[in-house]
């Protein structure tokens, strides 16, 4: 029995901006369903492997195509958001994306379309996690996730 004291080094290893599907994945898989603003949750190496695998499955099964989709835009005359149809590059089949990495609406969370930005967030996730997993000292680290909005 004694006074044991520790100082830990914390380092950011991945960053996302408005990648709400990734946030929703962490909520479902690491945060017991919901994470509050700035709330930390533990992330294991196996969690990182699963997230990477889920992203790769969606990327492999999907193709971007041009399609008319409803989007919300601000109408300065009406001084409100209105729904309009716009041509966007979106996934031709969203079924696997909706199952493994569904988007999540939120005031600061960005678009919920399964579009080019969605695909880019999955590609960035795969790249970031690949780099993390390649670190020879990975088993010495502990990981946590939190989001700020």
PLM feature segments, named:
Residues 1-149:
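Acidic (Asp/Glu-rich) sequence patches and key acidic residues
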């Amino acid at each position: 029995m004694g006074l044991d004291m520790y100082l830990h080094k914390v380092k950011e290893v991945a960053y996302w901006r408005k990648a709400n599907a990734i946030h929703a994945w962490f909520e479902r898989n690491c945060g017991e369903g919901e994470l509050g603003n700035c709330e930390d949750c533990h992330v294991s190496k196996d969690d990182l492997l699963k997230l990477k695998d889920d992203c790769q499955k969606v990327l492999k099964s999907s193709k971007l195509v041009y399609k008319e989709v409803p989007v919300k835009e601000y109408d300065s005359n009406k001084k409100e958001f209105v729904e309009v149809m716009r041509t966007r590059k979106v996934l031709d089949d969203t079924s696997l994306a909706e199952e493994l990495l569904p988007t999540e609406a939120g005031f600061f969370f960005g678009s919920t379309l399964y579009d080019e930005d969605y695909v880019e967030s999955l590609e960035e996730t795969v790249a970031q996690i690949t780099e993390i997993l390649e670190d020879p000292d990975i088993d010495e680290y502990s990981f946590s996730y939190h989001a700020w909005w």
